[in-house]
Amino acid sequence: MPPQRVAVIGHTGRGNYGHGLDIVWRSIDQVQVVAVADADDKGRAAAQQRLKVKNAYADYRQMLKKERPNIVSVATRFLDEHRDMVVACAEAGASIFLEKPMCRTLAEADAMIAACEKHHVKLAIAFQTRLSPRLERVRALIAEGRIGEILEMRGRGKEDSRVGGQDLMVLGTHIMDLMRYVAGEPRWCFARVAQSGKQGVRPITKADVREGGEGMGPVAGDHITAMYGFDRGIVGTFSSQRSERRQGEDDRFGLQILGSRGVIQLTTGSLPPVFFLADPGWFPARSKAAWQEITSAGLGKPEPLKDGGLGQGNIWIVRDLLDAIAKDRQPRSSMYDGRASLEMIMAVYESQRVGRAVELPLKNRQHPLTML
């Protein structure tokens, strides 16, 4: 079988090449990188040299037409370009490895998925943690009953300079995906989006809506609290709130899974920090229970794998994408996962807009902040 022809789309100065979505293909045997597209002249020349490709294009559409790749890395982080790039790739018959978050709105996500379905191509999104062998161990421990019945999940963003709306979009997308990995599809969301000021913390208004960075569209608020309802009575929360934080202090980014017999706490990455606490009271200072690390080998066992960072996660994703293409199945980090994570994010703003809990999937496919 001839190698798969791979092309790369980046945009220097506007999201560049994401978190290594261009160079991941160096580690994959069954492919040949044939071309790169970048609208920036200097960036394009640098990428051509970095990827060791003969052909480089200013216009990605021209590249798709001339090179006819089987797979394309849509690597730029700027979301305002994702829909058009993905639809063009799908129409050219190419499967896609896409930087996260998926796009700006559910309407855009719907259009991207419709194009991929129509042209029978696959799309894998860069949720590196979803492919982590440590996450597989987490699911196995939950299935074994090690934390008992799941009662609650608590997620937080990084709460750095992006606190609030931008944190929700950029880092919240990972937390939403982890919640779904653990508990399945959410059924409802109730949220409050607020803004701090001289008069304290108040609900957002239209005047608080601003354009987020990296082409992500409108964002708002610096105090966000969201609650999600899952099957079996499981509740998940996501928070991102402005507070005092000193330079160099650890952030609170990650997810806690709280069960009737214990707790699992994790963050993101190819081999993320993951720990288990056998304490039904969730109070180790009282119980004297000790946290145990969960590795790819199991609970309390040494980690046999080397942590290759997000790059290793990308390798696992594209290997799975190649297998998904060969077997005509959905990737383990699919376009449907990308849309579902975005749906949970949009539900936060929709709940704030209508002033009540909203059912998922959302009926409103436009950005709720444009409707205030």
Residue ranges and their predicted role:
Residues 44, 85, 112, 138, ...:
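Aromatic/hydrophobic pocket-lining residues that form π-stacking "cages" and hydrophobic walls in ligand
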Residues 12-18, 122-124, 129-218, 355:
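Predominantly a Rossmann-like dinucleotide-binding segment in NAD(P)-dependent oxidoreductases
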Residues 66, 70-71, 77, 82-131, ...:
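Beta-strand-loop-alpha-helix segment that lines the small-molecule cofactor/substrate pocket
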Residues 42, 266, 306-318:
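Active-site loop of classical SDR/Rossmann-like NAD(P)-dependent oxidoreductases
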Residues 53-59:
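Conserved SAM-binding strand-loop segment of SAM-dependent methyltransferases
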Residues 1-3, 8, 71-73, 110, ...:
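C-terminal helix-rich "cap/oligomerization" subdomain common to oxidoreductases
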Residues 174-278, 315-327, 331, 346-348, ...:
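Contiguous beta-strand/loop segments that form the cofactor/metal-binding neighborhood of enzyme cores
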Residues 1-51, 71:
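N-terminal Rossmann-like dinucleotide-binding module
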